[in-house]
């Protein structure tokens, strides 16, 4: 299977701490809290300098920037579960250092944007959340998991945990709004309107020089 990475990434710092190519298709997402209102750059340093020997596929800073630390084709070291991390895209989100580990509005918006992109590219039609640990791996029932199901940790914190249903609903709303093209409709593109015909003809020449051979001038009476 071929894998792609998110075009929403604005910072990349690939961590050496991963297991190489995953052994399962991507069908799950796991949201984590960093426990710190950090930047994507500082999180990248943490995942690269050996201080934690951990990683995630993506991270979101306090300011909403998105970083990539492990390419989607590879399994990150994030959830204390090999089976989970082989099938999940893992995302660390900057958060407060104390419970309930709240995240910023900018970080939350970027999280929803990133999840929508991940689902679209990997063929995940809907995010499903039932807060039920017994459904791990049953992705037709639930395809969101949390770190606390695999290790004695509070991650992702009560703030993000309580938002999982809302996050899934917003992502699913966006996924359902993809444009459906009507084969009986054509779309005309206008590049400009000029009072001077010479300017209009110059624009047509520029467009044709770029390969748009069907460009033409239309006169409109005001």
Give the ranges of each region predicted by the language model:
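Solvent-exposed, acidic/flexible segments
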Residues: 24, 51, 84, 100-108, ...
